[in-house]
Each structure stands twice: as structure tokens, then as C-alpha cells.
Amino acid sequence: MADKFHILLLNGPNLNLLGTREPDKYGHTTLADITADLSALAGSLGAEFSHFQSNAEHALIDRIHQARGNTDFIVINPAAFTHTSVALRDALLAVNIPFIEIHLSNVHAREPFRHHSYLSDIAIGVICGLGADGYHFALQTAVKRLSTSN
């Protein structure tokens, strides 16, 4: 790895519509706003940051595979794939990169089918219900964990 830690942010389906999609649940902040804020935060923490969003499960899996060997930590909002994707789980296990699962809304206060996650039991942690701030907490936690483990 390089001298700087590399953090990868992955966002799943429909998150490209943030800011306009159900703002009562997801807020008015756009994905572009979130990634710009995180890029600046990562820079201030001395970390490298990249991000990828896709509505396609296979594209997210491919990006996870590409992360092996050049990414130190993943922050992932799998969105609806949280509740359905064994394939994302298997990809994350295969690359063995620590990750935090994040959700803008409190999935436990929503429909029962949203209460189950195929990722949470293998994640370092799960952040939900804190809106865009949750992404900041996840990034800060990732850098702190990497800094104390090296």
C-alpha cells in the first residue's frame, strides 16, 4: 500500500437520485454533495478517497474485486442490495477488506423486509439513520482504525 490509506466509497441502487428521491426519508443532500464533502474530509485526514455508484449489482461486485490490493477500507451503502445480495456479501468476504455498512435512513424503523442485512454480520460496524452525517462518521472511523492498526 501507499503511504496514505485508500478509502473506497460504494453506493448502490437509486442513490444517484439522492436529493430528489423521497427527501423525507433520505434528505435533500445529493450524492455529488456527499462525495465532494467526503473527498475534502479524506484529504484533511491524509487519506486517499475514491467513490463508485451503480444501480447494477454486478458492477458493484466488479468494483469490489478491483479494490483488492489497492484499497485499505470500504464504506458501502448497498441500498436495496442490503436485503437481497448474497453476491455482494461473497465479494466482500473474497477480497477481505474491512468495511462499514451505512444507510441514510434508519432501516429498523421502516418496513420489516428492510430489517435484514446480508452484510452487517461481517462488517466492522453499521451506521444507519444519521443521514449524510453517517458517511462522515464512517470515513473518520475507517481512518482512525487504519491509523491505530498500523
UniProtKB/Swiss-Prot annotation:
Reported EC number(s) for this entry are 4.2.1.10
Q: Which UniProt keywords apply?
A: Amino-acid biosynthesis, Aromatic amino acid biosynthesis, Lyase
Name the pathway it acts in: Metabolic intermediate biosynthesis; chorismate biosynthesis; chorismate from D-erythrose 4-phosphate and phosphoenolpyruvate: step 3/7
What GO annotations for molecular function exist for this entry? 3-dehydroquinate dehydratase activity
Q: Per UniProt, where does substrate bind? A: 77, 83, 90, 104-105, 114
Q: Which Pfam families match?
A: DHquinase_II
Which residues are the active-site ones?
A: 26 (proton acceptor), 103 (proton donor)
Q: Which cysteines are joined by disulfide bonds?
A: none
Q: Which InterPro entries match?
A: DHquinase_II (IPR001874), DHquinase_II_CS (IPR018509), DHquinase_II_sf (IPR036441)
Its function, per the record, reads:
Catalyzes a trans-dehydration via an enolate intermediate.
On assembly, the entry states: Homododecamer.
What family is this?
Belongs to the type-II 3-dehydroquinase family.
Output the PANTHER family linked to this UniProt entry. Answer: CATABOLIC 3-DEHYDROQUINASE
User: What name appears for this protein in its UniProt entry?
Assistant: 3-dehydroquinate dehydratase
Species in which this protein is naturally found: Sodalis glossinidius (strain morsitans)
Q: Which gene encodes it?
A: aroQ
